[in-house]
Amino acid sequence: MPASVVLQQPDIPIAAIATPVGVGALAIVRMSGKGVFGIADRAFRKKSGKAFSFEAAEGFTAHVGTLFDGEGMVDEVVALVFRAPSSFTMEDMVEFTCHGGPVVVRRVLAALLDGGCRLAEPGEFTRRAFLNGRIDLLQAEAIGEMIHARTDGAFRTAVTQMQGGLSRRLLEMREGLLQSCALLELELDFSEEDVEFQSREELRGEVIRLQTELSGLVDSYQHGRLLSEGVSTVIAGRPNAGKSTLLNKLLGEERSIVSHMPGTTRDYIEECFVYDKTMFRLTDTAGLRESEEDVEHEGIERSYRKISEADLILYMLDVSGEGFREEAVSAAALCAGHPEARMILLANKTDLVKDSALRIAALETAAGSPVVPMAARSGEGIEELKLLMASMVEGLDKLHEASVLVTSLRHYEALRNASDALHNALGLIEGGEATELIAFELRSALDYVGEITGKVVSEELLNTIFGQFCIGK
């Protein structure tokens, strides 16, 4: 357990519903901590009628019986027994599988709370697993990512992290940093004797090796982010170009208001859809134009901010009127201001003109980006657009197979800080600076790596991480 945090109320067992709330065939209510076997004994009767005690039961065993509360029988249940330290939380645990009706589940939970448990905080079971040493902080976060994964690639990346893939890499780096720090500390302790326990050339080589490893992980975040969060895809264009219609067609539902009146979308709307194993986070933005109205103007400003953050820009033009060539040039200039983003021009309303082929050729020349002709209202061109979107991120779903990926902004920032500290240390070594200064930078890098795995952690950070979990996890 990290020295800076302690387990809250360790003597009070916790209980919570572990399955989604609602109507279902089955549900699970679990409890963990000291005294859970006694609580279970008071609420449970074995179906066979034979005397039974959870205190005496072996771990990893299942028992069929009836659960009671103060009003009588609640439900027939299956009780699973997990004995410390061989449970998820490394504490004694009991899980009751009951029927999935909301009244049944609520009464099962109430019986355990009346018996002496308190209601678990969000993520508290996983938090206890971390604090008791069952998993590190990376693995705890991976559990949350696995639960919320929307694609196979994101799921498999989370599984790799949960199994310790990234943890092992960081542990190896941490051992290297610890070794170098220890040798520098020895030098400081014996400074009067003017000895080097590790030559500066050897230290330089070790720092370069560690920084190269860290830089590789930092660089992997760009792809890891796309796998975990999805490809940020902004639908942009002037008012009444058909942006909201496109969003609805891509989603297959009426999510955005469609109107012939320009300026209907005053703020951006975000939704996700998965195509060819890749998740796209779609943002339907307010139409880009000059506006004197405060509300619409703010929506347009937000549109520009979303465009600046996008991985992919779907710029929609109405080719049924005049000025579309000039707008294509403006769209290209807009995208050029964000070179990390890619753009697809959508030539909408081609069904309303006879010379659509000529107009599309003019767009390709003007913008230098791929052009998809479409009639969004009828759905023409939607499948071609999806194929092009998928081709632009081709191979993303297989990235998890090649290496360990960083998917969390928190991990990315800590790794970048650690890499910066090693960069500073390398400059000090090459400049022949004092041992104290070099040691300070190496210790900083060590602390940043420790922040990721949980070796260096605060109560506030744990509350932020585990507060994003559901109560029963």
UniProtKB/Swiss-Prot annotation:
Cofactor: K(+)
TrmE-type G domain: residues covered: 230-394
Sorted UniProt keywords: Cytoplasm, GTP-binding, Hydrolase, Magnesium, Metal-binding, Nucleotide-binding, Potassium, tRNA processing
Chain sites annotated for binding GTP: 240-245, 259-265, 284-287
BP GO terms, sorted: tRNA methylation; tRNA wobble uridine modification
EC numbers on record: 3.6.-.-
Annotated Mg(2+) binding sites: S244, T265
Places the protein is found: Cytoplasm
Designated name of the protein: tRNA modification GTPase MnmE
NCBIfam families associated with the record: mnmE_trmE_thdF, small_GTP
Gene3D superfamilies: P-loop containing nucleotide triphosphate hydrolases, Probable tRNA modification gtpase trme, domain 1, tRNA modification GTPase MnmE domain 2
Similarity section: Belongs to the TRAFAC class TrmE-Era-EngA-EngB-Septin-like GTPase superfamily. TrmE GTPase family.
HAMAP family given in the database record: GTPase_MnmE
Cofactor details (free text): Binds 1 potassium ion per subunit.
Subunit (UniProt): Homodimer. Heterotetramer of two MnmE and two MnmG subunits.
Function field: Exhibits a very high intrinsic GTPase hydrolysis rate. Involved in the addition of a carboxymethylaminomethyl (cmnm) group at the wobble position (U34) of certain tRNAs, forming tRNA-cmnm(5)s(2)U34.
Superkingdom classification of source: Bacteria
Enzyme class per UniProt: hydrolase
Annotated positions binding (6S)-5-formyl-5,6,7,8-tetrahydrofolate: R30, E95, R134, K473
Molecular function terms from GO: GTP binding; GTPase activity; metal ion binding
Annotated GO CC locations: cytosol
